[in-house]
């Protein structure tokens, strides 16, 4: 399989991929969830493993990852552990154990894309980058701010930092307080998509940020998140509604 997430140039509106999260806490819940979500035919499936209550049992996680792959209907799987500091669920395993878990799922070919936080220690980032390259796993370096929206320059700098660290994709998610914040995020997205050599994924969260999830592709964001069952972040729309909005944008903005 080629790289699931491809670059857009930011100068021409393009339809973003749709990624749907999987947030089940048990193996049975995840299998039920992926069967329902895959039927909606998103472009990617994101397993938020920090929601999984057995994250501390490596063999259990690997077995579940294998089952998810078998039930994915060929849809690429994005593997994500989101830390508490960036909006994730509390877990009982160390950062070193998380890194080892990422290594295992990549080496066993159980996932297609991994999300690693920019704040991850340099040595661990370097280690995961090498394994991602070795296993041809696409890797995202991400930054999430659930408190505010940084300046346009700071958002752009985070995406540039992702590229400088060898990421295949850069991702930034922020929390807006005003519509001006949403526009700041979208302007930074357009600049990043126009100047970086890697794909970028951006979104503003919450109700205000929904606009960025619908129209982010017009500014160069390569992917947006939508829910089929349960949300993994504030502001995510149902996949059917989002797809309808993207169809309208395609028809009247991109001319597709």
Curated annotation (Swiss-Prot):
NCBIfam families: aroD. Belongs to the type-I 3-dehydroquinase family. One of its GO terms (biological process) is 3,4-dihydroxybenzoate biosynthetic process. It is an enzyme of class 4 (lyase). Pathway: Metabolic intermediate biosynthesis; chorismate biosynthesis; chorismate from D-erythrose 4-phosphate and phosphoenolpyruvate: step 3/7. InterPro entries: Aldolase_TIM (IPR013785), DHquinase_I (IPR001381), Type-I_3-dehydroquinase (IPR050146). GO terms for molecular function: 3-dehydroquinate dehydratase activity. The active site is at 144 (proton donor/acceptor), 171 (schiff-base intermediate with substrate). Transmembrane segments: none annotated. It comes from Shouchella clausii (strain KSM-K16). This is 3-dehydroquinate dehydratase. 3-dehydroquinate binds at residues 46-48, 82, 213, 232, 236. Keywords: Amino-acid biosynthesis, Aromatic amino acid biosynthesis, Lyase, Schiff base. It comes from the Bacteria. Involved in the third step of the chorismate pathway, which leads to the biosynthesis of aromatic amino acids. Catalyzes the cis-dehydration of 3-dehydroquinate (DHQ) and introduces the first double bond of the aromatic ring to yield 3-dehydroshikimate. Its EC number is 4.2.1.10.
